[in-house]
C-alpha cells in the first residue's frame, strides 16, 4: 500500500524512492509488526481473559502443566494481526505470491480459530475432529498447490493462466518448466523434474505437513515461536536471492520473478513472532493456540514451495520434523506391540518429543532454549546451501 503511494508521489518527493528498496521495506515491516504486537498484546490478553478462553490442559500430561490451565489461548490472533497490517502496508500488493501466502496463512488461521473455539466452549483439549480439520486443510492446500504449480514458472498472472490452459488442453499430462523442479541442496545445476501432478502432491504435503508439524511442536511456553521466526527469516533470505536476477544467477539458482517480495511477509512474520514471544515466554501470559500454529506452519510451507526449498525447509525445521516423527512412531509402536504382545508399549515416555525430555528431568525452560539453539544451528546449516553447492 505504502509502496504504491510512494511510487505515485516520488516525482514530487525524491526521498520516497527509498520505498522501492526491498530491504528497507523488510526492516519497516519487522518494526511495524513488532510494535503492533507489543502495543496490542496487553489488550488482547485482557480481552481473551474476559472471554474466558482459557487453555484446557491434558490430564495425562506432565503434572507441572496443570498450573497453566485457564491461561488465555487463541493468542495467535495477535500474530496474524501484526502480519496482516505490516504486510498490507509494506508489501507490493500487486504481487501474486503475497496473496497466495496470505490466503494459506489466514485460511489455516480460520481452521485453527474454529478448533480453539470448540476447545474453549466444550472444555475439550481435542477440539475439532482430525478428519474435519484435515479436510479443510486439504481444500486450502490443494488450491494453493494447483495455483503454485503454474505461478512459480511464470512472471504474470496472465501467463500463469495461459500455462494452466495449456496443461488442460494437453489432457492434464503436460510437464512444467525447470523453475518448478525439486531442487537438491549442495548440488549445482541438478534438480528433479516433478511434472504438474508431482508438484501438486509435493506442495500439498509440504503445506499441510508443515502446518501440522508446527502445531504439534506448540506445547511449551515459547517453544514454537522462536523456531518459526528463525526458519521464516531464513526462508526470507532465500526469497530475496531467488527474486533477484543478479543474486540468483550468481548463486546458480533459478530466478523466480516476484519471489523477493516474500521477504516482506517473512519479516512481518518475524516481527509479529517476536512480539508474541514477549508475552509467551515462561511463564506464558497467553498461548497462540491452533489459530496461530496452523497458520504459521502453513505460511512456512507455502514460502518454502515458492522459493523451491522444500528439502531445506525439512532441514531447517528439524525440530518440527522430530516432534512429528515422535508422535507417529509412538502411535505406530504402541499399536504394533498391542497386537503382538497384547499390551501397548511406548518408545518415548510421552509424545510429542518435548514432553519426553520433560519427563526425563529437563526443566521446561531447558527444553525450550535447547530446541531454539538446535533450530539456530539447523537454519545456519540450511543457509549454507546458498553457497556450498
Swiss-Prot record:
Pathway: Cell wall biogenesis; peptidoglycan biosynthesis. It is found in: Cell inner membrane. Its EC number is 2.7.8.13. One of its GO terms (cellular component) is plasma membrane. GO terms for biological process: cell division; cell wall organization; peptidoglycan biosynthetic process; regulation of cell shape. Keywords: Cell cycle, Cell division, Cell inner membrane, Cell membrane, Cell shape, Cell wall biogenesis/degradation, Magnesium, Membrane, Metal-binding, Peptidoglycan synthesis, Transferase, Transmembrane, Transmembrane helix. Its cofactor is Mg(2+). It is a multi-pass membrane protein. The chain crosses the membrane at residues 25-45, 73-93, 97-117, 135-155, 190-210, 222-242, 259-279, 287-307, 311-331, 366-386. It holds the Pfam family Glycos_transf_4. InterPro entries: Glycosyl_transferase_4, PNAcMuramoyl-5peptid_Trfase, PNAcMuramoyl-5peptid_Trfase_CS. GO terms for molecular function: metal ion binding; phospho-N-acetylmuramoyl-pentapeptide-transferase activity; UDP-N-acetylmuramoyl-L-alanyl-D-glutamyl-meso-2,6-diaminopimelyl-D-alanyl-D-alanine:undecaprenyl-phosphate transferase activity. It is an enzyme of class 2 (transferase). It catalyses: UDP-N-acetyl-alpha-D-muramoyl-L-alanyl-gamma-D-glutamyl-meso-2,6-diaminopimeloyl-D-alanyl-D-alanine + di-trans,octa-cis-undecaprenyl phosphate = di-trans,octa-cis-undecaprenyl diphospho-N-acetyl-alpha-D-muramoyl-L-alanyl-D-glutamyl-meso-2,6-diaminopimeloyl-D-alanyl-D-alanine + UMP. Catalyzes the initial step of the lipid cycle reactions in the biosynthesis of the cell wall peptidoglycan: transfers peptidoglycan precursor phospho-MurNAc-pentapeptide from UDP-MurNAc-pentapeptide onto the lipid carrier undecaprenyl phosphate, yielding undecaprenyl-pyrophosphoryl-MurNAc-pentapeptide, known as lipid I. Belongs to the glycosyltransferase 4 family. MraY subfamily. This is Phospho-N-acetylmuramoyl-pentapeptide-transferase. It comes from Paraburkholderia phytofirmans (strain DSM 17436 / LMG 22146 / PsJN). The lineage of its organism: Bacteria, Pseudomonadati, Pseudomonadota, Betaproteobacteria, Burkholderiales. The gene is mraY.
Amino acid at each position: 500500500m505504502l509502496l504504491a503511494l510512494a511510487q505515485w508521489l516520488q516525482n514530487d518527493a525524491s526521498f520516497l524512492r527509498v520505498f522501492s528498496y526491498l530491504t528497507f521495506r523488510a526492516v519497516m515491516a519487522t518494526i511495524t509488526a513488532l510494535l503492533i504486537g507489543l502495543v496490542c498484546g496487553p489488550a488482547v490478553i485482557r480481552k481473551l481473559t474476559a472471554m474466558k478462553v482459557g487453555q484446557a490442559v491434558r490430564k495425562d500430561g506432565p503434572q507441572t502443566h496443570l498450573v497453566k490451565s485457564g491461561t488465555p489461548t487463541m493468542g495467535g490472533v495477535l500474530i496474524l494481526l501484526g502480519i496482516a497490517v505490516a504486510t498490507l502496508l509494506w508489501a507490493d500488493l500487486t504481487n501474486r505470491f503475497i496473496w497466495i501466502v496470505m490466503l494459506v496463512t489466514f485460511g489455516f488461521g480460520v481452521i485453527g480459530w474454529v478448533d480453539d473455539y470448540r476447545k474453549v466452549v466444550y472444555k475439550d483439549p481435542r477440539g475439532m475432529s482430525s478428519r474435519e480439520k484435515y479436510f479443510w486443510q486439504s481444500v486450502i492446500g490443494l488450491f494453493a498447490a494447483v495455483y503454485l504449480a503454474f505461478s512459480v514458472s511464470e512472471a504474470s498472472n496472465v501467463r500463469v493462466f495461459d500455462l494452466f490452459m495449456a496443461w488442460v488442453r494437453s489432457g492434464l499430462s503436460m510437464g512444467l518448466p525447470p523453475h518448478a523442479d525439486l531442487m537438491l541442496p549442495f548440488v549445482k545445476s541438478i534438480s528433479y523434474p516433478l511434472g504438474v501432478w508431482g508438484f501438486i502432491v509435493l506442495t500439498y504435503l509440504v503445506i499441510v505437513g508443515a502446518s501440522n508439524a508446527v502445531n504439534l511442536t506448540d506445547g511449551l511456553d515459547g517453544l514454537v515461536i522462536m523456531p518459526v521466526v528463525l526458519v521464516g527469516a531464513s526462508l526470507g533470505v532465500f526469497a530475496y536471492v531467488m527474486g533477484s536476477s543478479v543474486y540468483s544467477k550468481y548463486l546458480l539458482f533459478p530466478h523466480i520473478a516476484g519471489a523477493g517480495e516474500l521477504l516482506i511477509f517473512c519479516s512481518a512474520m518475524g516481527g509479529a513472532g517476536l512480539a508474541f514471544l514477549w508475552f509467551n515466554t515462561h511463564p506464558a501470559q497467553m498461548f497462540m493456540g491452533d489459530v496461530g500454529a496452523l497458520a504459521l506452519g502453513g505460511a512456512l510451507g507455502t514460502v518454502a514451495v515458492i522459493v523451491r526449498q522444500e528439502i531445506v525447509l525439512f532441514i531447517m525445521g528439524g525440530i518440527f520434523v522430530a516432534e512429528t516423527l515422535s508422535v507417529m512412531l509412538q502411535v505406530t509402536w504402541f499399536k504394533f506391540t498391542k497386537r503382538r504382545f497384547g499390551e501397548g508399549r511406548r518408545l518415548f515416555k510421552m509424545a510429542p518429543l518435548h514432553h519426553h525430555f520433560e519427563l526425563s528431568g529437563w526443566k521446561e525452560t531447558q527444553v525450550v532454549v535447547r530446541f531454539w539453539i538446535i533450530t539456530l544451528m539447523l537454519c545456519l546449516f540450511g543457509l549454507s546451501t546458498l553457497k556450498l553447492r
